[in-house]
Amino acid sequence: MYYFYSPEMFAPYQWGLERDVSYAYMPYNSFYYGDYINSLPYAYIPQNYEVQMKADDRGSWTPFSWVEKYAYAFSGPYNKAEVALTFDDGPDLEFTPKILDKLKQHNVKATFFLLGENAEKFPNIVKRIANEGHVIGNHTYSHPNLAKVNEDEYRNQIIKTEEILNRLAGYAPKFIRPPYGEILENQLKWATEQNFMIVQWSVDTVDWKGVSADTITNNVLGNSFPGSVILQHSTPGGHLQGSVDALDKIIPQLKTKGARFVTLPSMFQTSKERK
């Protein structure tokens, strides 16, 4: 039997409505089957809450037990009216500064998952992110699919980036987000043993498609719930103006609904540093 779990949300679902939004594998707003969990590729929820899964879909499922076994999460506590804005792939010289300006305007702190190669190119932007009170996370050095690299390359991607960010931001980030949301169990095990925490997302704005501010706003407002981790991007150039502009709508409207914007260390009650 499949079960749909949906905590009280800031904005109720419109049952049966398809939105341009996708999810990482996540523990809330998902369909469960035994020890496995799967989220729909789009937020299409039938009115009777039932989904017919094909047998071959099982190959793409992630064991839900990983969330319990390792320092691994998709969203925060659903009993707190908190949401976290997160931005991947930066920094750059065009959109990251615009995002920082918007966050400062709205007095909101966020978490930026940075690529090591981009941090090397734009060190002053890394320093600005840190100096303005935002949290920096590790998004690997060159954005590989970690599920397709060997163990040595995986560790090198993380440690090399950590060294760069430590030098520029003044601390070694605790938080990792794997590119594409892809990670293997042995990689999770190593990261947990090294005192990292891996955080995916529960709401994907799909801003990388170059969609409009209104589409992004509808994606976020229609799918956010207490504990939501919202995924946006601060790079690549040429596609993200809609994501920047959407912040002027997302932030005040979620605040009006009672949401507090927090960083990931605050949401998970831990340090921003790997110690």
UniProtKB/Swiss-Prot annotation:
Keywords: Hydrolase, Hydroxylation, Metal-binding, Zinc. It catalyses: peptidoglycan-N-acetyl-D-glucosamine + H2O = peptidoglycan-D-glucosamine + acetate. Pfam families: Polysacc_deac_1 (PF01522). InterPro entries: Glyco_hydro/deAcase_b/a-brl, NODB_dom, PGN_GlcNAc_Dac, Polysacc_deacetylase_ArnD. Optimum temperature is 50 degrees Celsius. One of its GO terms (molecular function) is metal ion binding. Its EC number is 3.5.1.104. Hydroxylated on Pro-179. Hydroxylation alters the active site and enhances significantly deacetylase activity, probably by creating a more favorable environment for transition-state stabilization. It might be autocatalytic. The active site is at 88 (proton acceptor), 233 (proton donor). Optimum pH is 6.0. Zn(2+) binds at residues 89, 139, 143. Residues 81-262 form the NodB homology domain. CDD domains: CE4_NodB_like_6s_7s. Transmembrane segments: none annotated. The modification 2-hydroxyproline is found at residue 179. Its cofactor is Zn(2+). The keyword Hydrolase applies. Deacetylase activity is stimulated by hydroxylation on Pro-179. Inhibited by CuCl(2) and ZnCl(2). Inhibited by the hydroxamate N-hydroxy-4-(naphthalene-1-yl)benzamide (NHNB). One of its GO terms (biological process) is carbohydrate metabolic process. Catalyzes the deacetylation of N-acetylglucosamine (GlcNAc) residues in peptidoglycan. Also acts on soluble chitin substrates and N-acetylchitooligomers. Acts on cell wall peptidoglycan from the Gram-positive bacteria B.cereus and B.subtilis and the Gram-negative bacterium H.pylori. Not active on acetylated xylan. Belongs to the polysaccharide deacetylase family. NCBIfam families: PgAcgDacpgdA1_Bac (NF045821). This is Peptidoglycan-N-acetylglucosamine deacetylase BC_1960.
